[in-house]
């Protein structure tokens, strides 16, 4: 289990140093996978490791507060995505990596987009899967309300995977920190169209692929259409029968991988 130490991370500002656990496979151009808000274990990138490890050096870090990395208590900061992006730059620095392909899933896609905005020189290209644009997502509120209050209501297999990832005592905290951060973001919204990027999404100049499940339950009506308008230069692909995690879904991962490979080859 490789780890590295960061002197400081804005994603865990009250702790130092920070230990970051990461998975590493293959060799070649660096390809960094950024997990979603509930961690890596629930939506693993096993199929992508198999498909891409012969051509890429695959790195999959647990952000601080997740998995085997330094545990973090208390509320997440409202700008946790930006802070996580800064942590990922420090992660690259610690490994001596100048530039990488970033493939982010869900919250990880937001973090990847912020890397594209704030550190484009570190990004070879971006794959943004199950992307979030809006700060307030009414269609998901009941889902997150339920499991933030009663994480034990999750299915047994889901709880088992979360416990394996974060620990039996820690996984409910991981869920509650993420869910309540999204609640607080939503509750501060003054206009329904406020986005996570302060209107700057269209400033991303890094080559970008949006990879989205056609049946993603976490997507608001019109959300991806607005993304298309704000980033007409990006490639947008919808995965047939894909839900919120096409990369790990049995009926979607093969199409997901094919679309990603086509995009990556176009950037070679």
Positions of predicted regions on the chain:
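Catalytic histidine-centered segment of alpha/beta-hydrolase-like enzymes
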Residues: 242-257
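Conserved HGGG/HGGXW glycine-rich cap/lid loop of the alpha/beta-hydrolase fold
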Residues: 14-71
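Active-site loop/oxyanion-hole signature of alpha/beta-hydrolase fold enzymes
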Residues: 46, 60-103
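Short beta-strand/loop motif that positions the catalytic acidic residue
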Residues: 204, 210-212
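Short alpha-helix in the alpha/beta-hydrolase fold that links the catalytic acid
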Residues: 197, 206, 220-229
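Active-site nucleophile elbow and catalytic-triad environment of alpha/beta-hydrolase enzymes
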Residues: 180-200
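Flexible "cap/lid" loop of the alpha/beta hydrolase fold
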Residues: 110-118, 123-155
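Acidic catalytic loop of the alpha/beta-hydrolase fold
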Residues: 215-219
């Amino acid at each position: 289990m490789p780890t590295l130490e960061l002197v400081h991370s804005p994603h865990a500002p009250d702790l130092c140093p920070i230990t970051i656990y990461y998975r590493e496979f293959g060799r070649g151009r660096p390809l960094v996978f950024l997990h979603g808000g509930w961690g890596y274990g629930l939506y693993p990138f096993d199929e992508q490791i198999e498909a891409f490890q012969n051509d890429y050096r695959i790195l999959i870090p647990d952000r601080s507060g997740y998995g085997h990395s330094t545990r973090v208590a208390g509320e997440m900061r409202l700008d946790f995505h930006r802070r996580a992006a800064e942590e990922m730059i420090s992660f690259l620095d610690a490994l001596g990596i100048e530039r990488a392909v970033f493939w982010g899933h869900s919250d990880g896609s937001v973090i990847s987009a912020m890397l594209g905005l704030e550190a484009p020189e570190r990004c070879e290209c971006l794959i943004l899967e199950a992307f979030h644009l809006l700060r307030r997502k009414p269609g998901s509120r009941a889902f997150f309300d339920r499991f933030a209050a009663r994480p034990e209501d999750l299915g047994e297999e889901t709880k088992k995977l979360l416990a394996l990832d974060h620990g039996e005592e820690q996984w409910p905290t991981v869920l509650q920190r993420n869910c309540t951060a999204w609640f607080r973001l939503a509750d501060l919204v003054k206009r329904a169209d406020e986005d996570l990027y302060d209107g700057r999404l269209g400033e991303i100049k890094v080559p970008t692929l949006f990879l989205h499940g056609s049946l993603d339950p976490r997507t608001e009506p019109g959300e991806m259409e607005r993304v298309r308008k704000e980033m007409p230069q990006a490639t947008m692909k919808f995965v047939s029968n894909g839900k919120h995690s096409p990369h790990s879904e049995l009926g979607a991962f093969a199409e997901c991988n094919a679309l990603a490979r086509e995009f990556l080859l176009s950037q070679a």
